[in-house]
Amino acid sequence: MSARKEKSISAELRSFGRRRGRKPSDRQAALMRDVLPRVALDLSEPFSLLPSGRRCREAADEGVGSSHPANLSTPSPPPSPAHREAMLRIDGEREFWLEIGFGGGEHLVWQAAHNPDVTLIGCEPFEDGVMKVLTRIADDDLKNIRLHMGDARDILRWLPEASISRAFVLFPDPWPKKKHRKRRLVNPSTLAMLARVMKPGAELRIGTDIGDYARTILQAFSAQSSFTWLAEGPSDWRVRPIDWPETRYEQKAAREGRVRYYLRFERV
């Protein structure tokens, strides 16, 4: 397959549109230049959220993670068992949570602030959302957020097996046109990738305000055996959990009269 054809297929199947919105302010540009390289994950290197050796001492002085800029275009294969064992030994018992498509970042930042002993990995392809989170990282002195500005599938390939204790996919683009539904993020392929990186007993939370998408999600889960739906009654998917902060998008959905579905699944 030619590189041109492979690129066109990747663009056709991605679950997001254009990455850049309006021109960043001077401060936002400075955050992208100075802060993003210190919190961005480098997918060209083995799984490492807490650096070791000299880099660990440097990071302790700076109060942040890797000082190297992320390679946002070239994913690496999954790390070897030896690399994974070494990094988990360095990280100790620290939990890692993953949010795919964090949008404006309100949920990601809230979880980071309320769970300081957890490392939050946020994945978002759009610059506007990344800049908002970088602003909160700088203003609130948050040290437990790591970012990937790119395709979520790249980070799901990069993460080691059974490394994530909780994952969030909140109100992803529903791609309402029938011809575009193959772009929907929650699909059997993505579920298989999530199943690989999530620990047994880990919780996966998915939110949507589109009834058709909710049905599609439940159909995808019913066709696999890696996750079980935690709902025991209607209130379990109609009522937002107390530790699920309401975002501006959810508030807009409520104002417009759209039903919000709060779906929780457990990795078995």
What is each PLM-predicted segment?
Residues 219-268:
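Class I S-adenosyl-L-methionine
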